[in-house]
Amino acid sequence: MAGRRDSESAQSDIAPLLAGYRPLPGIFDEMMDRDGRVRSHWQPLLAMFAALGPKQLSARFAAADRHVHDSGVFYRVYEETTGAERPWPLSHVPLLIDASEWQMLKAGLAQRAELLEAVLADAYGAARLVREGRVPATVIAGNPEFLRPLVGVAPAGGVHLRFYAVDVGRSPTGHWWVLGDRTQAPSGAGYALENRLALSRAMPDVYRELRVERLAPFFQDVQAELSGLNRQDDSRVCVLTPGPLNET
């Protein structure tokens, strides 16, 4: 009963903050359930927003925007020929994913990465998928990105797919869908880091109280992975970009 009373109290505290908010029909709403109640893992964040009040909340959001601007975070659109920079649109309210749901999603994405690694290793190795008729040879050999000189070449550490990103989204029923795989030039990690820096500095109390999962372990793992490929102790690892006119 106590848990139910606490939930009802939280719903009451944040009600003024959400006045006029209505979920879109036919679309899964991250914040509200079907009954129009705020999901439990969103309640602490919205309660803190409500406690800050509109004036203080606007000031915090403005501070986050200044951080993004001062850091020089921009992006470009491929279709535009001018190459003009656009300010990075910071979302002041982050997407919240419950810890248990994140563990499920993380396990599924790790499994997908292992599958893509196996496919890539086979394409440049034994080619069983082609020989067994599971994948037409033209799909691989006819792909302009297929690097024939690398067939039979063992990569350092035995791993082909070192860095992998994936676009995910919700189905209308709330299930996670994979919308796209990013294996050639995965981008987004830098934007995620800048988003986190901007919001955590503008609202340090919010991030501290909510015990948000840290991003540092990811970047530490990337650094360790790249450094592990280095056979010399005194050399440095450099990450090259496509250049200043690239979208990201």
Please report, for each region that a protein language model flagged, where it lies by residue.
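Preference for protein termini
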Residues: 1-248
